[in-house]
Amino acid sequence: MKLKRQKPKEKFSYDPQKVLKKLEDLAWKILEEVKSGKNPYFDVPTRGLNNVYFDEEARLIKLGDKLSRRYFLNVAHARKFTQTLILMAYIKRLVSEGKHASLREAYYANKHTIPGTRENTFEDQSESDPIIEDLERMLGVLREEMHITADRRGYIYGDIVIKDGEDEFNASKLGTGGWAVPGTVEHIQFPEVNVDYVLVVETAAMADRLIEEKYPKKENCLIVATQGQASRGVRRLIHRLHYEEGLPIIVFTDGDPYGWYIYSTIKQGSINLAYLSEKLATPDAKFVGMTMDDIKEYNLEHVTEKLKGIPPDKKGGPTGDYKRLIEELNYPWFQNKEWQRQLKLALKWGVRIEQQALANKSLEFVAKEYLPEKIREGKLLP
């Protein structure tokens, strides 16, 4: 199976003015309610499992339409209402001035004692972070579009030209460490893309192995190392590379419940960030490994690891990996018969298989045989 770029489905569309307009429209609504003597309020999409569902057609985990109304003239709501206005004003200033702030900086920048009272605007970051999430859901924009950033994690390597502000560079010519993915990728542009597909790799050690073996050059692909669970910035970057550049996405993780969950968040989104799935998830992504079938296919039985936790048929079980496996077996997005088979095999055998276990064959095996053969033969899970 030859992987080829497809026709782009989206265009680069970041526009700070759109974010400012949404903020201002919401602020004008509140002002008009105050002027007319009404009790001003915000309608906030409800968080929680009871307002999350799996859209079979879109293949995405989505937020439902339940709302909670937050009034100013309500003792139970007034504090959060005021905090929302404070952060809206702060975000407007950030976007207008073209500056960015971390979640921690946003908390400290807005923490102060209200004049004439002993009341602080925020007592802890655990108060400001949820308000920023509320604004994401209320405005329908990413916090990164509001210039609020998170810690950076992950890197890319391959023949793709990146434009980051005034800087323009090729991600295959920055040394073997590649380009570190920033917390915010909304402003990043791709003037030149010379790869056929994206290979998303869970561990930095495996990504480094593939780079050392010159896999990106030989197979003409872009390596994206997530370094564990993919950050929002990495997931957004993967989404953009697929939808704006038409690049197929192949995911390569450890063969365990954690690795498979990493894949599912890249593909379908996550329950916690269901309201952002349409901007972060990539439903067309495919999974190359590791799988339970790989253990038999490549004679890796002697390098498997035992699942962590207590099995369901033992006292106190299921816990750990076993508990996560059973949860995944019941997720709507893992109901495909191929995935059900893999999950049940893991549960039956009680083992997991790491990416690095392929080194038992040889250091070059993963780059010269395992990945090229599986991708060429189309041995990919949906």
From Swiss-Prot:
PANTHER family: MEIOTIC RECOMBINATION PROTEIN SPO11
Single annotated GO MF: magnesium ion binding
Domain Topo IIA-type catalytic: 14-155
E.C. designation(s): 5.6.2.2
Cofactor(s) this protein requires: Mg(2+)
Any coiled-coil regions, as ranges: none
Residues reported to bind Mg(2+): E202, D254
Family to which this protein belongs: Belongs to the TOP6A family.
Name of the molecule in the record: Type 2 DNA topoisomerase 6 subunit A
Assembly notes: Homodimer. Heterotetramer of two Top6A and two Top6B chains.
Biological process per Gene Ontology, one example term: DNA topological change
Catalytic activities: ATP-dependent breakage, passage and rejoining of double-stranded DNA
Record bears the keyword Nucleotide-binding: yes
Keyword DNA-binding attached: yes
Active site: Y108
A GO-annotated cellular component: chromosome
